[in-house]
Each structure stands twice: as structure tokens, then as C-alpha cells.
């Protein structure tokens, strides 16, 4: 066997399209909540691959599922079905409101499918219907949301920095103010086919929806015959301490999108819905080559069965408290956070006015001390670690984070 091509961080700059600016080290191995780089330096992982590695790195049962399926069949295409995809569909149906599932490969694809379904359902059921004024194809989304990078989903996202360079954008999308029901009510009409919302805005700053807001959206969608879509790409599969965040609120969507943690690190996504809405997508109306891939579904089935247990879900809530206590101690020392918010193990630390705009500085300094974290905009440090991270790793990670914060504080005062 030929020796692997030697690579360094500089190789990224030479060979990769620069849509990202990764850290200056290369991770080569992971186990549990710990990562190691090419030089053997260890890092506690508070990022979880952006809320993906829900069971940490190298979980033995997940690895075994992948190897077992790899010895059977890898890929078939959508002209044939397979056992893992059917079993995973049944698991999701049994665990949620859903009656039908569409599998794809990423959160953006799942949201794209959800929005297409909503427009198709409206076309099939309301076009030329007596009393219907105008075409029913408008989509209501919310400012500072994030729904993916396809042209359709990035247009729904409500963050111009991600969409403004790709005009002309798809039309028929308007954006209300998140957590402002009056703003939504002014936009949702009988011409609205869908409302798409995150129960917690992840990229938008780890901002949870108010219960009254989501209940109000449900009522408005019912009144105007609009499809209510919950984007649970980041909040789903145990991240908040329930299998899906809608379960906290007692608000059931018509369509739910899931990705990230669903595969525990293996790319897979799903759109969940009921028979009523699924009927809008018939043979040939939508599709994907890799969706329902046997390898992905075998892994996801194992991930879902491991997470959807009382022990793991209650453990997420317990770990949330461990984080809050540790972060409060850090803030008592350094006074950098104005607010700590989120649910379960999706946590956002909002920087106060003295440190506004320094979220990237903090995570870069923290990395020097062996902790990997995320940002959610310039003013929010975000954590989305493994759902089964140990108390020891949380304490050690927060200690390393504190060293990074101290470094930023010293620099700010010098």
C-alpha cells in the first residue's frame, strides 16, 4: 500500500476552495469527548462537530453498526429499498408525531424538501379553490434564522450575509421577527403555504423560542391552512434533553427536519411528516441519490436507539446544570457574559458590552489551551458537546476555557 500523502494546515489553503477558515491544527484522532492533533496535543470537544457527534467520537456500538453494515451492502440507489432505512423510518415514526419519513443527506436538503412539500401541498389542495384569493405559495421565515446553504434554504434563512451575493434569490419568502407573534401575524395570510421556524435559533445566537410564540404560530397556521415546519436540524435527537425540542413546548409541527446528530457523525438527514402532507410528494416529484443509504441508516438507527432512552435524555438535562454552574463560576471571576441561554447541551454564552464582538477571539484562545468550542455570531460563544460527555471532561474543559478567557481579558485590559 502506498504511503499517505503528507498534509499540513497549509495544504488546505493550497487545495481547498476557501469557503471555510479552519483552525491552524489538524485533528487526526478522537475518542469520547477528546480529540488529538497531528502533534499529539489533546483537546476537550465542546463543539461536537457543530451538534453532530452526539455520542462523542468512536462510540463502540456505532462503530460496530457501521462495520457490520459495511460487510453487507453500501449503496443501492432509490430504485430499491433496504432493511436499515425501513427500520430507521419505523424508529422515527414510533418516537414522534410522524407517519412518513423522507431521507436525505443534510439539513439543507431536509429543509429544501420540507419547503417544496409545502408548496406542492398548497398547489394540490388550494389552487383554484373557491374563496382562495391569489396563489398560495408564500413562505414566512424569521430573521437571524439558518436553514441551510442551498439557494432556497439560504433565502429562507433571514441572514443577508449568507445570501446577498447570490441574487436573484427565490421569491415568495418574507421574514418576521423571531419571538414576536404580532410580526408573524402581520405576515401570515391565506396566501401563506408554510411557516418555517427553529425552536432554538442556533446560528442566530442560541436563542430559544418562547412557548407563547410557537403556540401562536401553530394557531396562525391552522387558521390560514399553512404548513408549520420545525427546523430541528440542530435541536433534534436529544440535544435539548427531549428527543426533539417540540416536545418541550407541547406544539406539534406538520413537518419536522432532522439531521446533524441523527447520524452521530455519519451524514444523514430526514424530513418527518404525516400522511396528510406526505401525499403531496408522489413518485418523481422529489428525490435524492444517496438518501436512505444503508450505511447511513444502519448507523443512525443505532445512534437513535442509544440516545432515545430515559437515562441519556435525563442525563442531558443534568449536564446542562453542570455547565451552568461551571460557567457561572467563570463569569464570577472574569465578568464576560451578559447571559447564558439555551436548552440541554445547546448552550450560548452572550458576551457583555465590554467583550462584544470577541467570541472568535475567545474560542481561538481557548483552543490554545486545549478546548474546542463554537461561536454563534460575534457575540455568542456556543457549546454543543457529546450528550454523554463525562462530568470530569466538562470540568476539565471549562478549566481550559477559563484560561482562554483570562487570556482575552488580559489582552483587552492591556
Swiss-Prot record:
EC no. given is 2.6.1.81
Which catalysed reactions does the entry list for this protein?
Answer: N(2)-succinyl-L-ornithine + 2-oxoglutarate = N-succinyl-L-glutamate 5-semialdehyde + L-glutamate
Names of required cofactors: pyridoxal 5'-phosphate
Kindly give the InterPro entries that the UniProt entry links to this protein.
Ac/SucOrn_transaminase_bac, AcOrn/SuccOrn_fam, Aminotrans_3, Aminotrans_3_PPA_site, Class-III_PLP-dep_AT, PyrdxlP-dep_Trfase, PyrdxlP-dep_Trfase_major, PyrdxlP-dep_Trfase_small
* N6-(pyridoxal phosphate)lysine carried by residues: 260
Domain of life of the organism encoding this protein: Bacteria
One record GO biological process:
ornithine catabolic process
Entry-linked SUPFAM superfamilies:
PLP-dependent transferases
Keyword set, alphabetical order: Aminotransferase, Arginine metabolism, Pyridoxal phosphate, Transferase
Quick check: keyword Transferase in the entry? yes
Q: Name one GO molecular function term.
A: identical protein binding
Question: Does the record bear Chaperone in its keywords?
Answer: no
What pathway annotation does it carry? Amino-acid degradation; L-arginine degradation via AST pathway; L-glutamate and succinate from L-arginine: step 3/5
Q: What's this chain's function?
A: Catalyzes the transamination of N(2)-succinylornithine and alpha-ketoglutarate into N(2)-succinylglutamate semialdehyde and glutamate. Can also act as an acetylornithine aminotransferase.
Q: Which family does it belong to?
A: Belongs to the class-III pyridoxal-phosphate-dependent aminotransferase family. AstC subfamily.
What PANTHER family has UniProt attached to this entry? AMINOTRANSFERASE CLASS III (PTHR11986), SUCCINYLORNITHINE TRANSAMINASE (PTHR11986:SF113)
**Which HAMAP family does the UniProt entry name for this protein?**
ArgD_aminotrans_3, AstC_aminotrans_3
What is this protein called in UniProt?
Succinylornithine transaminase
